Curated annotation (Swiss-Prot):
PTM-bearing positions, type N6-(retinylidene)lysine: K296
The organism of origin for this protein: Pomatoschistus minutus
Biased composition (Low complexity): 342-352
Lipid bilayer topology: Multi-pass membrane protein
Residues in the Extracellular compartment per record: 1-36, 97-110, 174-202, 275-286
Residue ranges annotated as Cytoplasmic topological domain: 62-73, 134-152, 225-252, 309-352
Protein name: Rhodopsin
Keywords (A to Z) from UniProt: Cell projection, Chromophore, Disulfide bond, G-protein coupled receptor, Glycoprotein, Lipoprotein, Membrane, Palmitate, Phosphoprotein, Photoreceptor protein, Receptor, Retinal protein, Sensory transduction, Transducer, Transmembrane, Transmembrane helix, Vision
Region (Disordered): 331-352
Upper taxonomic lineage: Eukaryota, Metazoa, Chordata, Craniata, Vertebrata
Domain of life: Eukaryota
Disulfide bond residue pairs: C110-C187
Primary localization: membrane
Protein family: Belongs to the G-protein coupled receptor 1 family. Opsin subfamily.
């Protein structure tokens, strides 16, 4: 094994020189330059500084403006809550531990940080799945006369929490475990060892299939069908400028959504699966650290993609920030009027 395994930790370095120490008790500066820990702390501070305001603003603006309190926006609010879970449960902890160079909060802190980071990420992921299914059902109409109501939204929120819990809770009760990973300043599921009594192998396979491949397939299917529906509508009205504009908007939105999903989760899932299937292979601490924080940074660009690109929300947000006035109101109104004139309007094919 090209690493050192101890009680509830795995260090990606062979302890031939005797310098490897527990990441709960000693600084891990022998793994990487101390400057890397400072950079990690700075990056976490940046995510807190940007992720908290934009997600809090999402909650505040939605609660302030009655016209935003729609059934679908409950899912978007759930997404913002999930991102705030990651900010407070994961980013603040990682920033604090990186300042010390090791997981100074101990085993209990590792469980708490790993749980909240996993829970927040999974709630966000399954919220995106619910959004994709909702857009597919509403726009493509596989179920005739279907109307997305508040009850459907509540069920979608409950579904996202249940699915997130089925991923975040098991490591707390003995099916796998949370251990420090990468530079040993944040905690995640144990992909690294086959520790006796934890059944890591079965949990990782379960998590990869149910909590990565399944959401990926659903999102691709739903937005693929959505794009086809918009193209068919545009073909039926080839001379309609507003329809063609709606198609371009949806195409751009779908591309951004897919890229956002893949950028967040594909690197992390791929590296985790590689480590799991190649246990004993030599790799450095940055090998897992970098993709892990690609996934965590989704707390910043999730609301930018799924909420700030919504015209109605953007209008309300500007109104709130400008003390009740929108200096761009005439331009926003004209754009909205043009889009609503289309039989395939942006309100039907955008995330909200």
């Amino acid at each position: 094994m090209n690493g050192t395994e101890g009680p509830f930790f795995y260090i990606p370095m062979v302890n031939t020189t005797g310098i490897v120490r527990s990441p709960y008790e000693y600084p891990q500066y022998y793994l990487v330059n101390p400057a890397a820990y400072a950079a990690l702390g700075a990056y976490m501070f940046f995510l807190i500084l940007t992720g908290f305001p934009i997600n809090f603003l999402t909650l505040y603006v939605t609660l302030e403006h009655k016209k935003l309190r729609t059934a679908l926006n409950l899912i978007l609010l759930n997404l913002a809550v999930a991102d705030l879970f990651m900010v407070f449960g994961g980013f603040t902890t990682t920033m604090y531990t990186s300042m010390h160079g090791y997981f100074v909060l101990g085993r209990l802190g590792c469980n708490v940080e790993g749980f909240f980071a996993t829970l927040g990420g999974e709630i966000a992921l399954w919220s995106l799945v619910v959004l994709a299914v909702e857009r597919w059902v509403v726009v493509c109409k596989p179920i005739s006369n279907f109307r997305f109501t508040e009850n459907h939204a509540i069920m979608g929120v409950a579904f996202s929490w249940i699915m997130a819990a089925t991923c975040a809770v098991p490591p707390l009760v003995g099916w796998s475990r949370y251990i420090p990973e990468g530079m040993q300043c944040s905690c995640g599921v144990d992909y690294y060892t086959r520790a006796e009594g934890f059944n890591n192998e079965s949990f990782v396979i379960y998590m990869f299939i149910v909590h990565f491949l399944a959401p990926l397939i659903v999102i691709f299917f739903c937005y693929g069908r959505l794009l086809c529906a918009v193209k068919e509508a545009a073909a039926a009205q080839q001379e309609s400028e507003t329809t063609q504009r709606a198609e371009r908007e949806v195409t751009r939105m779908v591309i951004i959504m897919v890229i956002g999903f893949l950028t967040s989760w594909l690197p992390y899932a791929s590296v985790a699966w590689y480590i799991f299937t190649h246990q004993g292979t030599e790799f450095g601490p940055l090998f897992m650290t970098i993709p892990a924080f690609f996934a965590k940074s989704s707390a910043l660009y999730n609301p930018m993609i799924y909420i700030c690109m919504n015209k109605q929300f953007r209008h309300c947000m500007i109104t709130t920030l400008c003390c009740g006035k929108n200096p761009f109101e005439e331009e926003e109104g004209a754009s909205t009027t043009k889009t609503e004139a289309s039989s395939v309007s942006s309100s039907s094919v955008s995330p909200a």
